[in-house]
């Protein structure tokens, strides 16, 4: 199944890659690769991950303190957030309304 980023989720992902890259380029690459691998797993078996609210599911990265929040749309997976666990857990909820 294909996937798309919500624009704000794409920004979060890019900002996080930049943050880790500034600390260490290899760390930025590792973060990027890990998130891409998690998204790949989501696209292969989207219903396996925990539902956290309504139709929103979450898959947690292993090495970094992030969760990938997504919904299963008709023809694709919509990535709603690339969420660092230190953030307010509800900051992304307005993104559901914009896309439903």
Residue ranges and their predicted role:
Residues 7, 39-44:
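Outer-membrane beta-barrel domain signature
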Residues 44-77, 82:
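Basic/aromatic recognition patch in beta-strand/loop cores that engages polyanionic ligands
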Residues 71-100:
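Enriched for short, Lys/Arg-rich terminal
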């Amino acid at each position: 199944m294909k996937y798309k980023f919500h624009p704000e989720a794409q920004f979060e992902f890019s900002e996080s890659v930049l943050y880790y890259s500034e600390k260490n380029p290899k760390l930025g690459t590792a973060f990027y690769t890990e998130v891409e691998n998690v998204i790949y797993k989501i696209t292969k078996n989207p219903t396996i991950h925990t539902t956290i609210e309504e139709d929103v599911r979450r898959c947690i990265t292993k090495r970094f303190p992030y969760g990938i929040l997504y919904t299963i749309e008709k023809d694709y997976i919509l990535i709603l957030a690339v969420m660092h666990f230190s953030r307010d857990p509800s900051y992304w909820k307005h993104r559901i309304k914009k896309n439903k």
